A protein has these predicted regions:
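A compositional/biophysical signature of low hydrophobicity enriched in polar/charged and small residues
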Residues: 1-106
Length: 106
């Protein structure tokens, strides 16, 4: 299954909800959400500063993860950025592929 790193920043409304609900309840909600989509929550960390949470998940595919991202964004409670994570073995496979690329202007 593809693995993703999601960086999240709560809006004011989302932060109010987090204060009311608590961190462990939020993690449990994300865990249940991922299971319902056929995925898995691997890690969930809160932070302070520009970003409020770092979440590592496995999802069944990019389409399902995009649907999740759209739904979360539409809630208005949190802003997210999701990064597809690759294993070292996947990079080895990518390095062996021939890609014909012409830089702009060449």
């Amino acid at each position: 299954m593809p693995k993703y790193l999601t960086v999240a920043s709560y809006t004011a409304e989302g932060a109010k909800g987090l204060l009311k609900e608590g961190g462990t309840a939020r993690r449990a909600a994300v865990d249940e959400l991922m299971k319902s989509l056929g995925g898995r929550l691997e890690a969930f960390y809160f932070a302070f500063g520009d970003n409020d949470a770092y979440v590592i998940t496995e999802g069944p595919d990019n389409v399902t993860t995009a649907a999740l991202s759209l739904t979360v964004s539409a809630s208005g409670a949190v802003r997210t950025k999701t990064i597809v994570l690759l294993t070292p073995e996947e990079i080895d496979q990518a390095a062996k592929k021939t890609v014909k690329f012409r830089p702009p202007g060449s």
